[in-house]
Amino acid sequence: AIDVSLVGSEMCIRDSSGLDSSLKNGEFKLGVDLFSSEMNKGKHVISAILLKEGKSKGSRTVLDSTIKTKITDKQTIWFKKNIKNVYKWSAEEPNLYKLQVTLSDPFGKTLQSFTQQVGFRTIQINNGLLKVNGKPITIRGVNRHEWDPINGRAVTRASMVEDIKIMKRNNINAVRCSHYPNQEVWYELCNEYGLYVINEANIEAHGMRFHHNGYKQLTNDSTWSGQWIDRGQRMFERDKNQPSIIMWSMGNEAGDGKNFENLYKWLKYKDSSRPVVYEPASKKNHSDIAFPMYKDIKYLLKYAQSNKSKPLILCEYAHAMGNSVGNLKDYWDIIDRYELLQGGFIWDFADQTIEKENEDGDQFWAYGGDFDDQVYNNDSNFCANGLVAADRSPNPHFHEVKK
């Protein structure tokens, strides 16, 4: 099962921490939104403690601040502090701080308390390059579905840790959450172990390609605008404080139109610190990065030589189905030659097959057509595009990736 929690919160937090212009010092900036019908009964106390946890020397307190306030309506309380020579977060050096925020009533009773990770880092696009902490990065990424060979979409924390460790051991430094926001613990683990994350809104409309108006039927229909914003908003509000998330993706293969333009504006208004990307908008103003899929090497070469102002990152390439991924060296010879080409995400990480037993009692990996559904349409083995099998044993072409 997947955990689902509905919580009526009296306090929400917004961590906007980053680096100053020197890229050496941290700028801690925490907004605490308070709202409750009971907040007008005396002064409430909000405390914020920021700790740097060391492996050998224990925790060190960086911030310990308390604010007392009487709340008569929704209000935002700010905690700010400059931190000299801050430990910066990146995929290579995932330094984290621990934040504890507590709301107490006038009598000292704790009403709500949060603990979360804080990573100090900046994300910029300047001179046509995507930079983290002032340095251009190269994305050696994979697309990943949430998948378990026994439980399907219900994945455990232990399996997430295993996925991350496999990626890190094989020189993978980034993951695209295809094609929906993942469980919250996934981002916390990416913060901890060090993976760059592209978080993706659950907006997809493959089936509309069969409509006589195609994708534009929905993407330009204003009656669907609210649904577009809602899915982007839910992604952003839940995951906005995760330092591993360096980009927002508006969705996958859902065409393009006014609804995506509006979602782009909403996300940029709420968060100017991260790029927003979307594959069909790669050549338009509502994608900050060219984010194409399955473009050949000639396309990359032409783009790199055109002096474009946008960096290019392949959102999908090197489709890892069957005997495949043999052209990685050709791709990376070009990527390594041109700064404007900043990598890509292989499709995809793991086969989405499921363990099944045949009539002889032998276990096998089942896919479309193996579930007494031969009379129904299915995609056969098109769910088996992984660098690893469903049980995470490496497929032969995975060895090409580590090189």
Positions of the model-derived regions?
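Short, solvent-exposed loop/linker segments at the N-terminal edge
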Residues: 19-26
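Single conserved hydrophobic/aromatic residue that forms the stacking wall/gate
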Residues: 1-8, 12-13
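Internal, hydrophobic beta-strand segments that form the core of beta-sheet-rich folds
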Residues: 93-105
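Beta-sandwich strand segments
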Residues: 57-60, 107-114
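Beta-strand-rich binding/interaction modules
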Residues: 26-68, 77, 99
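Extended substrate-binding grooves/exosites of carbohydrate-active enzymes
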Residues: 9, 110-403
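Short glycine/proline/serine/threonine-rich loop/turn segments at secondary-structure transition edges
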Residues: 39-42, 82-96
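Exposed aromatic-hydrophobic patches
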Residues: 73-84
